[in-house]
């Protein structure tokens, strides 16, 4: 792209959760990202695109066309540490009251620069507006990960 503040993105996800009304979900999305602002210690990027998802083994076992709206925010605290959050909204194109919301927030610190090894602590909240009868629409996960760059 000619504009350095614009970019194409592609995302894919595989979700498996025994507390949901499906065995697993596959989602694929692509679209345009725009860098809204970038300073030395913080940045904000917005994303808008479209794609599809399918919940295998559940009541809605079919491909659902979706839009995607999201943002990625980052704040560098020091040269080695940062805070970040990612937000994504996935409304069903055919029924806008059917949507999913994903929110991830975390803290990351660089442990070894030569290996590009980082320690990441995060929370990940998933909300489904139509989770299925007897299932909770909100799912909060948390984690600690050791991350290596390539």
What are these regions (language model features)?
Residues 7-16, 45-54, 83-93, 121-127:
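Transmembrane beta-strand segments that form the barrel wall of outer-membrane beta-barrel proteins
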Residues 97-150:
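Predominantly the C-terminal beta-signal and adjacent terminal strand-loop region
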Residues 1-31:
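Hydrophobic/aromatic-rich structural module bridging two neighboring secondary-structure elements via a short loop
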């Amino acid at each position: 792209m000619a504009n350095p503040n614009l970019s194409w993105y592609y995302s894919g996800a595989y979700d498996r959760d025994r507390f949901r009304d499906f065995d697993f979900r596959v989602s694929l999305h692509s679209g345009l990202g725009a860098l809204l602002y970038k300073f030395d210690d913080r940045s904000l990027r917005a994303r808008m695109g479209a794609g599809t998802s399918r919940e295998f083994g559940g009541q809605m076992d079919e491909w659902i066309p979706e839009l995607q709206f999201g943002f990625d925010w980052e704040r560098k605290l020091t040269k080695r540490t940062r805070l970040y959050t990612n937000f994504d909204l996935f409304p069903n194109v055919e029924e806008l009251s059917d949507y999913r919301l994903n929110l991830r927030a975390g803290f990351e610190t660089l442990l070894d620069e030569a290996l590009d090894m980082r320690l990441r602590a995060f929370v990940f909240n998933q909300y489904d507006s139509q989770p299925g009868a007897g299932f909770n629409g909100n799912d909060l996960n948390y984690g600690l990960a050791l991350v290596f760059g390539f």
